[in-house]
Amino acid sequence: MYRVPEFYARRKRLGGQTPYLMDQLGLRLGMWYWKDETRTLEFRRFAAEDSVQWLLKHHPHFTPAAEVKEKGKKGKAVHFAETDGPASDRLTDKRLAAKDDKSAKAVEKRGQQGTITLDDVKFVTLLLLQDTEMQRICSFTTFMRNKNLDNFLMALLYYLSHYLEKNSLEKKPKSYMVGLVEKKEMELVLSELEAAQRYLAQKYCILVLGLAVPDKHHMCCGKEKISDTQKDWKFFESFYTFCTYVAWIVFRRQHLTEIEEEVGRLFRTNMFNIPRRRREDEESGGEKKRMTFVQFRRMMAKRPAIKKAINMRSPVMSTLLPSLREKAQNVFEKKYHQVDVRFPAEMQKHVGTLDSVPMPVVGILGEPRCLFNPHTLHPLDPEENTKSFGRYPSLMENNNMRIQDTLDLVMKTLSSHTSCPK
């Protein structure tokens, strides 16, 4: 009887026991390969037959009687390309350049879409002030995305829009007989200006108290026992400058002197109003004249004492927290300057609805981005600066419509009273 060779029997025993032994020992045969999708090395486990063939092929004590046919490998071969050569550097540079061009074009295309927002104006202002006010503005950059800052800036812009409208009405040529329309128009603007100043005072008090920005407060909202006046001074000086230039850019880079003086008047007392002093020096010719002792005493008499100057309040703060003297002055003005005009109930209701009409878009806010340079917010068409708010209705037009409606109601009321039989 033909005897089976020993090495063949041992090979068969090993072939039957290999999967079991491998599972018992926790060993797994397979192959590592590079996966392009995830750019990682991954392990692919062999099947039972493949593992037996690999073991027989690499085991030193056994040699197979016949060569085992190798099956096609399912995994991809690992290829490592050299990245140190100049060709690879050029290829990488080309890819990065093409990617940068595409991203720049995409950003520019996105930048031309939509409308101008307050964030656009804030960042343009910050870039504008980096050259001249770099030291003070750097401490202000962390405050840029604060919601309370946005609320305050919008309140300031609404106030300045009414203020500029009032100035334009005052500069209009006046006739000898001021009509009812002009009086009513000025009354509407003044009432809206007063309401806007009250709203601005509320938003300003939030910033002064440091409710949302304790790190900018001079006493860290009570966490510190000593007032850091230097930090407080630097922050608010940069803050006033920033607000002035935001308003200047929003109003198409016009009326800078008027905006600067009004911001200085609102948030500073007369003693510390630097723009006002500068204007007075320019009006006097800029020359320091020698004064006599009498003239010096007269000039100093106009200025308050130091104790009084410390407790003085800016016009914005006195709107919500007036002193006793300011309260008495307000009562006196309301008593003698209030116009005693009484309208019918229907007319008062109609006037109330007219006053609740929201104000139109302020300056360039809300206008299409494609009309402006995205880096400076200059209008691409120079004639746009001469136009008053373009296609959007101005505050003057709205006021004229409201006045005309009021006058129509007055005429209807008077005609109904005169047509009644006696």
From Swiss-Prot:
Q: Where are the transmembrane segments?
A: none
Q: Which GO terms describe its molecular function?
A: phosphatase binding; protein phosphatase inhibitor activity
| Keywords annotated in UniProt | Protein phosphatase inhibitor
Q: Tell me the InterPro entries matching this sequence.
A: Pro_pase_1_reg_su_36
Coiled-coil regions, chain positions? none
PANTHER family given for it? PROTEIN PHOSPHATASE 1 REGULATORY SUBUNIT 36 (PTHR21055:SF3)
Described purpose of this protein according to its UniProt entry? Inhibits phosphatase activity of protein phosphatase 1 (PP1) complexes.
The UniProt subunit note reads as follows:
Interacts with PPP1CA.
Q: What is this protein called?
A: Protein phosphatase 1 regulatory subunit 36
